[in-house]
A protein has these predicted regions:
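Short sequence motifs at beta-strands and strand-loop junctions characteristic
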Residues: 45-47, 78-80, 118-120, 147-149, ...
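Detector for outer-membrane/organellar transmembrane beta-barrel domains
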Residues: 131-211, 222, 226
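Short glycine/proline- and aromatic-enriched beta-strand/turn motifs that initiate or cap beta-hairpins
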Residues: 9-72
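Transmembrane beta-strands of outer-membrane beta-barrel pores
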Residues: 33-39, 59-61, 69-73, 104-110, ...
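Bacterial Sec-dependent N-terminal signal peptides
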Residues: 1-14, 272-279
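Short loop/turn motifs that connect adjacent beta-strands in outer-membrane beta-barrel proteins
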Residues: 16-25, 93-100, 134, 162-175, ...
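Membrane-embedded beta-strand positions of outer-membrane beta-barrel proteins
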Residues: 29-31, 55, 65-67, 88, ...
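Outer-membrane beta-barrel "beta-signal"
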Residues: 157, 262-279
Length: 279
């Protein structure tokens, strides 16, 4: 999750349970700033931040494509290009109670990119949301492809509040308190030593070192966020404070390069963007 961009909320709504509105072609462009880069709460040791220009096009057929340009900076490096991610997918017809999508992503990082998730080269995902007046429930699953394949699942609860502004045409403020949990497979090498007892005659015992491949499925993080989005006509701005709590960090003895770093952390995502609709 290189960038956590926030789209403009939908101001119009309907009361029926059919398709919410006739689909339109939508072009979206935004710039996102993330104060502390993380991937499921995992961070690099340099406390990097990032800037992510994003462009996307949603076809009225449901097909869509998104390109994200990744720039990172930290105490040892000024803002520099680190890679590009490309996502293509299909959004299911949206109704009063359902929305969802399937997507495939390709990540193209530079050789010098120091990003926690840079080992992931491709990803396939499916997400579905059940919407009601109390809480929206989202579930998702994904396959992450690197030197090996990992499975991830996510669950999210949120409730969207939209306040239309009087005196300003086509404007609103949206607040969307959100709680999320992410789980997935973890594959790593574990080495441990076992000492055997001495034999008769007083000879010392021996120490045997054993290495094994470990494949586990664990909770990876909990995250709480409160996106606040301001929309005026075709333009929008968002500020998303978030608190992430990583779980089950991998620690490999004497191999820090194979270990994960992370702790409970607060960070902010800021977004400005433009959304254009046309038939």
């Amino acid at each position: 999750m290189a960038a956590r961009s926030q789209n403009a909320p939908t101001i119009d709504s309907t009361k029926n349970d059919s398709t919410v509105s006739t689909r339109k072609n939508v072009f979206n462009a935004s710039v996102n700033y993330v104060s502390r880069l993380n991937y499921l709460g995992r961070v690099d040791s340099l406390k990097s931040s990032g800037v992510f220009p994003v462009i996307s096009f949603d076809s009225k057929t449901g097909l869509y494509a998104t390109g994200t340009f990744i720039f990172t900076q930290n105490s040892l490096q000024p803002l520099a290009y680190a890679g590009t991610s490309i996502e293509a997918g299909y959004k299911f017809p949206e109704s009063k109670h359902f929305s969802g999508n399937i997507a495939y992503s390709k990540f193209l990082y530079t050789n010098t990119a120091d990003i926690v998730q840079s080992a992931v080269k491709e990803q396939a995902a499916v997400n579905a949301t059940w919407k009601n007046k109390y809480v929206n429930v989202t579930g998702g699953a994904e396959l992450r492809f690197s030197d090996q394949t990992d499975i991830g699942v996510t669950g999210t609860l949120d409730h969207l509040f939209i306040f239309k502004l009087t005196g300003i045409k086509k404007s609103a403020i949206a607040i969307d308190p959100t709680a999320a949990i992410n789980a997935g497979s973890q594959k790593f090498v574990q080495t441990y030593s076992k000492k055997t007892g001495g034999i008769l005659g007083g000879l010392p015992g021996t120490t045997q070192t054993t290495t094994q491949n470990v494949n586990q499925f664990n909770i990876l993080d909990y995250e709480f966020s409160v996106p606040v989005v301001f929309v005026i006509d075709k333009f929008y701005a968002a500020l998303t404070p978030a608190y992430v709590m990583p779980q089950n960090l991998i620690a490999v003895s004497n191999k820090p390069e194979l270990s994960e770093t992370g702790s409970n952390m607060f960070y902010i995502t800021a977004t400005v963007g433009m959304r254009l609709e046309f038939r």
